[in-house]
Amino acid sequence: MEEMSGESVVSSAVPAAATRTTSFKGTSPSSKYVKLNVGGALYYTTMQTLTKQDTMLKAMFSGRMEVLTDSEGWILIDRCGKHFGTILNYLRDGAVPLPESRREIEELLAEAKYYLVQGLVEECQAALQNKDTYEPFCKVPVITSSKEEQKLIATSNKPAVKLLYNRSNNKYSYTSNSDDNMLKNIELFDKLSLRFNGRVLFIKDVIGDEICCWSFYGQGRKIAEVCCTSIVYATEKKQTKVEFPEARIYEETLNILLYEAQDGRGPDNALLEATGGAAGRSHHLDEDEERERIERVRRIHIKRPDDRAHLHQ
């Protein structure tokens, strides 16, 4: 196999004393092998592959640009190495299978633009356009485990809204309006998932410990939570009351849009800071304050202080 990546990941930060600048003038493109360290990912390839198409890599390895090497002869490129193997395969073969997920296609597109691989840039852009054209439907995953939920949220480049509803968790009878309010929460979730399709990841959870609870996530962490249930007393008997805090749910959904990526560059930190968003404030905090911020979640429990006075609601 012409290109291979080392399994061990090394640091991309190399001391200045261990590096030197060299030029590849006068080399034989057909036979020379090159060792590349791309952001800590190690690759072997040939000069023929690197100079086959008119890209930035051809400029680097045909003598038009100087390259940086370490003491062991690895050529250092200060980029993420995740998709560099795909770049090499495209340079060698002129075609390559694209990733399935939109996020990975966008990542590959950014690398192709950096290395000036115009053909791959066009293929990535066409693939993204096709996804917009042929995948207009709304996908709402129903999680099967907490591990699956964590993976979904951690790997998504979108803010997320999760509705947990699980009637089987209730130990008591419901108040008279609870069934209607439970249905209203579910219907609102469906409406929001259609309204913000493509911008927000919506998740259903029917295995959790709560009866009805909304959770809102940004940049992979929980930002807010709205719990819609409480326990009330009616003639010395406990009952479960389900509320429908429509305005609060709309408010938290709009708040979570502040964490939406802008043109693939992440959320607008200036906007987050101006509106009090946590991510926008993070660069002003020391390590302890940052840890406290990450652990802090805005939790709203919908419960009226006069519940005992409304025994038969």
UniProtKB/Swiss-Prot annotation:
Main location group: nucleus
Alphabetized PROSITE patterns for the sequence: BTB
Gene of this entry: KCTD10
Compartments in which it is found: Nucleus
Parts of the chain that traverse the membrane: none
PTM-bearing positions, type N-acetylmethionine: M1
GO CC field: Cul3-RING ubiquitin ligase complex; cytosol; nucleoplasm; plasma membrane
GO MF, one annotated term: identical protein binding
Superkingdom in the source lineage: Eukaryota
Protein name: BTB/POZ domain-containing adapter for CUL3-mediated RhoA degradation protein 3
GO terms (BP aspect): negative regulation of Rho protein signal transduction; proteasome-mediated ubiquitin-dependent protein catabolic process; protein homooligomerization; protein ubiquitination; ubiquitin-dependent protein catabolic process
Subunit structure: Homotetramer; forms a two-fold symmetric tetramer in solution. Interacts with CUL3; interaction is direct and forms a 5:5 heterodecamer. Component of the BCR(BACURD3) E3 ubiquitin ligase complex, at least composed of CUL3, KCTD10/BACURD3 and RBX1. Interacts with DNA polymerase delta subunit 2/POLD2. Interacts with PCNA.
Alphabetized UniProt keyword annotations: Acetylation, Nucleus, Phosphoprotein, Ubl conjugation pathway
Extent of motif PCNA-binding: 239-245
Pathway assignment: Protein modification; protein ubiquitination
